[in-house]
A protein has these predicted regions:
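Alpha/beta-hydrolase superfamily serine-hydrolase fold, recognizing
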Residues: 2-335
């Protein structure tokens, strides 16, 4: 399959050719982009720039980590959904995917888009997980302020955020990841990983030789993110495996929904298949959809608008909200 749209300059290489996706134990979704998801059906209230943690950076500075919270303007306590933005582990902009977050909030959830440390902060995957867990704990401890049902929470991430969501969801009971946040409030009842990375050394496995060789021969920022700045992937296999969510798949893991576009030019769709198969082998409830023709989420807006529309179609977004209702409504307070 060859893709030749004009693409913007990006901090990661863009594939020219993509192998057909592995559909084992997965479902191929042939999505009509219309109708698009609904918006404006429920009045929302927002709480912006909510500080949930202050962290020390390697340069001696400190940084406040913040969340933007959306919820229906009712007095009802609702399950919490933490949204983790993507950004190639180079940036984390909590303002991303606003319409998607609005739709999910209108569907009956408290949706908090949260910041987490990334490579330019000197952050590693351990720091990202700690930050997300801090957001979970703080928001649930202040459930009264936001109308949160603290018994029910999910993680939902896109791209790099999908990686962090999966890793956080699978390590809630491990002391090395939880530290002083080892509490049930730091665990979740469901995880959504949308076109996320996993085993970073295999990020280009589905792509053309030029992109594969780039990752083999270049010490990228991904090496810094796994704690080995300046190293090639071939030099740090243990560190790469330690940062891979699939490493921590167990039978006690929460249910997972994984989604990936068949035409993803930035992250091989085999990355979510890798996590999906590890979860299934461990005996975990895992569902994976491959969206036919879809690109890398909002990246499609820049290069292929039709491919981007799949991610905001009623079909795909309804799969997300139905998954959340199925696993969070039963975990929370009677409604």
């Amino acid at each position: 399959m060859t893709h030749t749209p004009s693409v913007p300059r990006l901090p990661v290489p863009v594939a020219a050719t993509i192998a057909p996706p592995d559909l084992a134990d997965s479902t191929l979704l042939e999505v009509n982009p219309h109708p698009q998801m609904s918006l404006g059906t429920v009045e929302l209230e927002s709480h912006l720039d909510v500080t949930f943690s202050t962290v020390d950076l390697p340069n001696g500075a400190s940084r406040e980590l913040k969340a933007d919270v959306l919820r229906p303007a009712t007095g009802e306590r609702l399950p919490l959904v933490l949204f983790l933005p993507g950004g190639a582990f180079l940036r984390c902009n909590k303002a991303m995917a606003l319409d998607l977050r609005r739709h999910v909030a209108e569907s009956g959830f408290v949706v908090a888009s949260v910041e987490y440390r990334v490579a330019p902060d000197g952050g590693t995957y351990m720091d990202s997980v700690h930050d997300v867990r801090a957001a979970l704990v703080q928001l649930r401890q202040h459930a009264d302020d936001f109308g949160i049902d603290p018994r029910a929470a999910a993680l939902w991430g896109e791209s790099a955020g999908g990686h962090v969501a999966a890793l956080t969801g699978l390590t809630g009971e491990l002391p090395e990841f939880s530290g002083d946040l080892a509490t049930p409030l730091g665990t979740v009842q469901a995880v959504i990983d949308a076109f996320g990375t996993s085993l970073l050394s295999a990020i280009a496995d589905d792509f053309d030789e030029e992109v594969r060789l780039h990752y083999e021969r270049t010490a990228t920022h991904f090496s810094a993110y796994v704690g080995k700045a300046g190293a090639l992937f071939s030099e740090i296999p243990e560190a790469v495996v330690a940062a891979d969510p699939a490493t921590y798949a167990t039978a006690s893991a929460p249910p997972f929904l994984l989604l990936h576009g068949s035409a993803d030019m930035l992250v091989s769709s085999s990355q979510t298949q890798h996590v999906h198969q590890a979860l299934r082998t461990a005996g975990t409830d895992s569902t994976r959809y491959v969206v036919d023709g879809a690109n890398h989420g909002d990246f499609g807006v820049l290069a292929d608008s039709d491919a981007a529309l799949a991610w905001t179609s009623a079909t795909v977004v309804n799969d997300i909200t139905e998954f959340l209702h199925r696993h969070l409504d039963s975990a929370g307070l009677p409604r």
